[in-house]
């Protein structure tokens, strides 16, 4: 908090998705803060190279998630394994891949722009569904897209095990199931996010780890900083 905010107490209302009461120092976690560029390709000869960039980012994203799975198998945290499987399957989904490639080819845009359009397409489909659980699965598509975008940008994907201090509450705009599953329980006592819901895969992982969590706080990241 800033010095001004520290002088007063304020209450934020969210959705408790995993029970418990904790007190700890804040650790701001921004895993999705990649700098993304959207641009048109000025030469059709660049299209094959752009498609190759996209495919390489898919491969790297798959490799990263498989590594996370292997690390989790060495622990007692098994619930996230099937959820990460879902993300890996999406990375090889032909409709997802072909739609993105089609945008690159037909519109002459870079892979990042094409990927964002693919995400928008899926958002329209999921948001029109009445079932809250199924419509909430758009978050899984978003997590996968963000990982691909970060790999396209060449930026390192920040991981929760980078937390140096102990007894911290992770505060983030959002957390993927993979991010949550990698939290070291001897260092992290709970987490709070701006977005998210009770039926999200991240919430399921938190409950399986018995990690106190509140999501859907809208703007908690505006009020706090690490420490």
Model-predicted regions and their roles:
Residues 1-227:
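Non-catalytic, soluble scaffold/interaction modules
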């Amino acid at each position: 908090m800033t010095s001004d905010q520290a002088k007063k107490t304020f209450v934020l209302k969210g959705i408790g998705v995993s029970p418990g009461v904790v007190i700890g120092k804040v650790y701001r976690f921004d895993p999705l803060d990649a700098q993304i560029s959207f641009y048109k390709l000025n030469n059709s000869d660049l299209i094959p190279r752009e498609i190759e960039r996209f495919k390489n980012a898919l491969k790297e994203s798959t490799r990263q998630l498989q590594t996370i799975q292997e690390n989790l198998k060495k622990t007692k945290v098994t619930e996230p394994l099937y959820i990460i499987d879902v993300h890996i399957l999406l990375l090889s989904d032909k409709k997802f891949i072909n739609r993105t490639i089609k945008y690159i080819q037909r519109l002459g845009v870079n892979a990042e722009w094409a990927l964002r359009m693919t995400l928008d397409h899926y958002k329209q489909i999921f948001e029109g569904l009445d079932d809250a659980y199924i419509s909430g699965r758009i978050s899984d598509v978003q997590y996968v897209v963000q990982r691909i975008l970060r790999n396209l940008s060449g930026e390192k994907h920040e991981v929760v095990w980078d937390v140096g201090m102990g007894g911290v509450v992770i505060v983030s705009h959002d957390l993927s199931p993979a991010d949550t599953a990698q939290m070291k329980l001897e260092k992290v006592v709970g987490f709070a996010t701006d977005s998210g819901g009770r039926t999200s895969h991240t919430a399921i992982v938190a409950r399986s780890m018995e990690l106190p969590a509140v999501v859907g706080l809208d703007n908690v990241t505006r009020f706090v900083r690490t420490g």
